């Protein structure tokens, strides 16, 4: 089986490094599916799930957005925040979502709403991943 090397790197650590059969990432234009020998590509990623598929199964990683660099034999994903799906905290994500929604409701014109919207999108993406994982376990 042909493989491609994938590295998922956050601002603080290397979260994943290994050979995979394919990787899926949430690009700004839609989900990317990357297989071995893929054409070179550079794209912006939005908050969401990165899935790496190996002969041992699928591993999911939450990213807060970032950049993906694809070469025929190597994929590198850079993100400010990356968390293994099993380590996502639903209560923290719910709190962050509530804080962001309240901040948007109480925002004045002089405040930077775009930063608040980014925080809201990140918390929603985390909650969607948690729900997806929960539904697979049932």
From Swiss-Prot:
Entry annotated with the keyword Protein biosynthesis: no
Keyword annotations from UniProtKB, A to Z: ATP synthesis, Cell inner membrane, Cell membrane, CF(1), Hydrogen ion transport, Ion transport, Membrane, Transport
Membrane topology summary: Peripheral membrane protein
InterPro entries registered for this protein in UniProt: ATP_F1_dsu/esu_C_sf (IPR036794), ATP_synth_F1_dsu/esu (IPR001469), ATP_synth_F1_dsu/esu_N (IPR020546), ATP_synth_F1_esu_C (IPR020547), ATPsynth_dsu/esu_N (IPR036771)
MF GO annotations: ATP binding; proton-transporting ATP synthase activity, rotational mechanism
Any one annotated GO CC term: plasma membrane
Gene3D superfamilies named among the record's database cross-references: ATP synthase delta/epsilon subunit, C-terminal domain, F0F1 ATP synthase delta/epsilon subunit, N-terminal
Location in the cell: Cell inner membrane
Stored Pfam families: ATP-synt_DE, ATP-synt_DE_N
Family of this protein: Belongs to the ATPase epsilon chain family.
PANTHER family (alphabetical): ATP SYNTHASE DELTA/EPSILON CHAIN, ATP SYNTHASE EPSILON CHAIN, CHLOROPLASTIC
Subunit relationships: F-type ATPases have 2 components, CF(1) - the catalytic core - and CF(0) - the membrane proton channel. CF(1) has five subunits: alpha(3), beta(3), gamma(1), delta(1), epsilon(1). CF(0) has three main subunits: a, b and c.
Protein's job: Produces ATP from ADP in the presence of a proton gradient across the membrane.
Protein name from the UniProt record: ATP synthase epsilon chain
Annotated organism of origin: Ruthia magnifica subsp. Calyptogena magnifica
Record lineage: Bacteria, Pseudomonadati, Pseudomonadota, Gammaproteobacteria, Candidatus Pseudothioglobaceae
């Amino acid at each position: 089986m042909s493989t491609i090397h994938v590295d998922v790197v956050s601002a603080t650590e290397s979260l994943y490094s290994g050979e995979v059969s394919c990787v899926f990432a949430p690009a700004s234009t839609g989900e990317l599916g990357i297989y071995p020998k893929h054409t070179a590509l550079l794209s912006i990623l939005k908050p969401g799930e990165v899935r790496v598929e190996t002969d041992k199964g699928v591993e999911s990683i939450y990213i807060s957005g970032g950049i993906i660099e694809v070469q025929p034999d190597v994929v590198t994903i850079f993100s400010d925040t990356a968390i293994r799906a099993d380590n996502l905290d639903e209560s923290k994500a719910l709190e962050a979502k509530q804080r962001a929604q309240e901040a948007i409701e109480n925002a004045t014109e002089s405040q930077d709403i775009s930063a608040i919207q980014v925080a809201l999108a990140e918390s929603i993406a985390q909650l969607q991943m948690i729900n997806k994982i929960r539904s697979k376990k049932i």
